[in-house]
Amino acid sequence: MAFSKKNNIFGSNNIFTILKTLKDESLLKENDSKNLEQKNNSFNVPKILNNVNISTNCEVNTSKILNYRGLTKGLKESNSTITNNGIFVDNKILISFDDIREMYSYYADYRIKLQYILLNRQKSILETIHSLDNKKGELFKMRFNYNEIVSNEFKIRKCIKLCMVYQNLIELYKLVLRLFDLLKIMTIDNGTNVIVMLNVSDLSIEKKKQFFESKQKIERYLVQTKNILNLLDGSFEKYKSTISQFLDYIDDTIKQFSTLSREETKILSSKTSEMFRQVDDYLRQIINDFDPHTNCEYYVSIDLENSNPINPVGIRHCTYIKCDSELNLAIKNKKIDKNILENISQEELEKLFTHVKRTNDDDFIRIYHGEPQMCPIININFFVENKIPLSGVSVGITNLPKNATILTSIINNHRQYNKYDDEIIPVPLYSNHMFETYVNNVLSDMTDDEYNNLNHFLKIKYNKEDTNNTKFIVDYLFEELADSSQESNLIKPEMFESFARLVQSNSYYGR
């Protein structure tokens, strides 16, 4: 976990804030001799896996499910029930690879935004190095294909602008369709048109107001969309003619509003609905054409009672994007210390450009496959929204492509802490209390100076890479509290386990 100067947790005033953002209380237990934490930062499937399942479509995994951190017990007699619609079978949550494909397709526009941020970040870093050391900067620009980065970033920027045009188009068509609904109410069966109805005294003032406000909003959107369209040039010229046709249709349609009868309103409304579907399909096609298929982490929730079980939450590479974010050119790049960049090696910079920051503590699905038009590795971090009356539950993927392999965790019991005699019921978690409190936290990395200033005990127990997990944070906070109470002797080393339980009960995670 990171420590920024602006949001430094070294001050005691921030201790409760840190407790509120801690995650995965199952990690609060002190390291034992088995060291059950399995690092999965590598793209390769590990040879030895202590807490995961591996399966392929070529063979059936008949081995007993591994006891996840010594906590699983077996069936839990509970009144809780799950609607069995074929998703939850025996001790597995079954998800079709078709659902994975649909999820992957849904994330395409977020991959475009993520790729734009990555390229912009790489360009900025290389330019900063060049400004600090001209010779080194030229060498690094050549080594990392700076010109290609700039060219690709420019194309993605144009693509996002094109998508923004289509987003505006979609909003335009939605507005027009809403206006058609209003027109159907305002017109009457005898053919009286809208302009006559607007002059009828018994027509409510509210409906007249809605009509004119909606019409004006459409006209404003139309002008705004045309202005964005004028920014597209070069290879994007080919899209302009199609977009212009969609815009001309809107322009012609709103000019007819005042003279439409009810029957004409129905016909034009139906035609507009069809045009709306075409706009939506065309936008999806453009997004698919420009999809960079970036290797990244997907954050989802799984709902066992829904026929479409995967609900997107966010996406991550060097930064985290929530799924309710707009596709635009806004960027919040984390600045890198100039001293680091001045002394950075080629190998370190390559790792900085390509490394996907992974969370090792969340429930996960890793799919290694050979499907075309998809990233060959799909990394999914998830939580289940439903109560499961079983322990030792994992995820299984059906309809896997030939020779595909999956790697999954046994689902965490997020509310239990070190209760070996209790049977496990994994419980609902929510995105606001889980992924975002970790992956979207501004405290994302500890600097070298901050690590060097830690006390000797913590540096022996944790290397710098381990300082972004909950176990380190709990140890650190306890050490700080113990040091601050040396005179009063209120906090003793043997109180650590009680402190860890207190952290769990006061954190968002597991509520």
From Swiss-Prot:
The taxonomic lineage of its organism, from the top, reads: Viruses, Varidnaviria, Bamfordvirae, Nucleocytoviricota, Megaviricetes
Q: Per its record, how is this protein called by name?
A: Uncharacterized protein L490
